[in-house]
């Protein structure tokens, strides 16, 4: 059975955000605005997305 995947896209700049939020964005594999990654939908990834939800958009991959 294939694991569910989600697409995460950075839609706002990380300038002026907390260092921990910038680290979380890097942990998700995002570098610049409009960069996207397809990630496995796990509780760990969901927690990271919840932390920086105001910077990213999420859709099903």
Swiss-Prot record:
Q: Which Gene3D superfamilies match?
A: Ribosomal protein L30, ferredoxin-like fold domain
UniProt cross-references to PANTHER family, sorted A to Z = LARGE RIBOSOMAL SUBUNIT PROTEIN UL30M, MITOCHONDRIAL RIBOSOMAL PROTEIN L30
Hey, which family's this protein in?
Belongs to the universal ribosomal protein uL30 family.
Q: Which SUPFAM superfamilies match?
A: Ribosomal protein L30p/L7e (SSF55129)
Q: Which GO terms describe its cellular component?
A: cytosolic large ribosomal subunit
Q: What organism does this protein naturally occur in? A: Bordetella pertussis (strain Tohama I / ATCC BAA-589 / NCTC 13251)
Protein name, as recorded: Large ribosomal subunit protein uL30
What processes does the entry annotate via GO biological process terms? translation
Q: Which domain of life is it from?
A: Bacteria
GO MF term set: structural constituent of ribosome
Cross-referenced InterPro entries, in alphabetical order? Ribo_uL30_ferredoxin-like_sf (IPR036919), Ribosomal_uL30_bac-type (IPR005996), Ribosomal_uL30_CS (IPR018038), Ribosomal_uL30_ferredoxin-like (IPR016082)
State the oligomer form and interacting partners.
Part of the 50S ribosomal subunit.
Is Ribosomal protein among this UniProt entry's keywords? yes
Which keywords appear in this protein's UniProt record, sorted alphabetically?
A: Ribonucleoprotein, Ribosomal protein
Identify the Pfam families for this entry.
Ribosomal_L30
Under HAMAP family, the record lists: Ribosomal_uL30_B (MF_01371_B)
Look up keyword Disulfide bond and say if it applies: no
- Tell me the gene name: rpmD
């Amino acid at each position: 059975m294939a694991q569910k995947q989600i697409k995460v896209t950075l839609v706002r700049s990380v300038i002026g955000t907390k260092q921990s939020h910038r680290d979380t964005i890097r942990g998700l594999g995002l570098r610049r605005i409009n960069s996207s990654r397809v990630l496995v939908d796990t509780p760990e990834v969901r927690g990271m997305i919840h932390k920086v939800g105001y910077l990213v958009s999420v859709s099903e991959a």
